[in-house]
From Swiss-Prot:
GO terms for cellular component: chloroplast thylakoid membrane; photosystem II reaction center. Keywords: Chloroplast, Membrane, Photosynthesis, Photosystem II, Plastid, Reaction center, Thylakoid, Transmembrane, Transmembrane helix. One of the components of the core complex of photosystem II (PSII). PSII is a light-driven water:plastoquinone oxidoreductase that uses light energy to abstract electrons from H(2)O, generating O(2) and a proton gradient subsequently used for ATP formation. It consists of a core antenna complex that captures photons, and an electron transfer chain that converts photonic excitation into a charge separation. This subunit is found at the monomer-monomer interface and is required for correct PSII assembly and/or dimerization. One of its GO terms (biological process) is photosynthesis. The lineage of its organism: Eukaryota, Rhodophyta, Bangiophyceae, Cyanidiales, Cyanidiaceae. This is Photosystem II reaction center protein L.
Length: 38
């Protein structure tokens, strides 16, 4: 644990959560568009 840079992990966590948030919004947008256009 001492060899890991402590400043690196929160940045990766924020990028991962941001990626999953955008992916979730994209999937919801596709589902809603399929509902509306059907």
């Amino acid at each position: 644990m001492s060899g890991i840079n402590p400043n690196k992990q929160p940045v990766e966590l924020n990028r991962t959560s941001l990626f999953w948030g955008l992916l979730l919004i994209f999937v919801l947008a596709v589902l809603f568009s399929s509902y509306f256009f059907n």
